[in-house]
């Protein structure tokens, strides 16, 4: 029996999980992969990838001023610009802490639109969703939290993160390393982490504890989870990815369930 059937015991009405290998193939799945789910902050992975395309196209640069005084695109992508979680209030000086911010990502979308004249949702559609044939995916509002997609589409995206075709391998490799090292901060739902490592929009597992991935996941594991009860992780060392979507908001149930589930998913494919 598949490890993935554990999701049937979670307190959600609907759930789906898919595992993708280094060849981009789905090697395990459970649940309706065609059902559309709100992604919440997993949206940031789609947005981050869109920003990487924009960087390669030189529509924007990491050095472009954006956000509060002294901040750049680089700071906003790495959650070090100083913004509050969901408002323009400034919580700390630029580059001194890791302050996870929806507002910061929304400022990135504004900057991209100002530089290109193209709405973020349209840029994502043209740059990422259409090339990957993600026909049931959209960003319908905030680029930080208003994405909608299916497990089938996100499996295609996970395959892209394992074997990039839209951006250069080096671009993705650079985006999924730690930027602005040794910064402490709060990982929502899991408390203060020191360091609270992040790449360019991608959360990096590093040495964080507690965490939503498994204890055996390599430090290089990257991804994101969302308040709507969703997550996507990529383990570049073992060439493996997992997409899991539910319709139960994140809470203590997820803190209790996700890490052991992800540990078993990893072990089932690497033992």
Where are these regions (language model features)?
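Catalytic loop of the DD-peptidase/beta-lactamase superfamily, centered on the K-T-G motif
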Residues: 1-38, 96-97, 113-118, 122-126, ...
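Residue-level detector of alpha-helical secondary structure
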Residues: 6, 49-53
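Active-site helix/loop module of the DD-peptidase/beta-lactamase fold
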Residues: 38-42, 46, 54-91, 100-103, ...
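Well-ordered alpha-helical segments within folded domains of soluble proteins
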Residues: 46-49, 103-110, 152-156
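Well-ordered alpha-helical scaffold segments within catalytic/enzyme domains
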Residues: 52-55, 108-114, 161
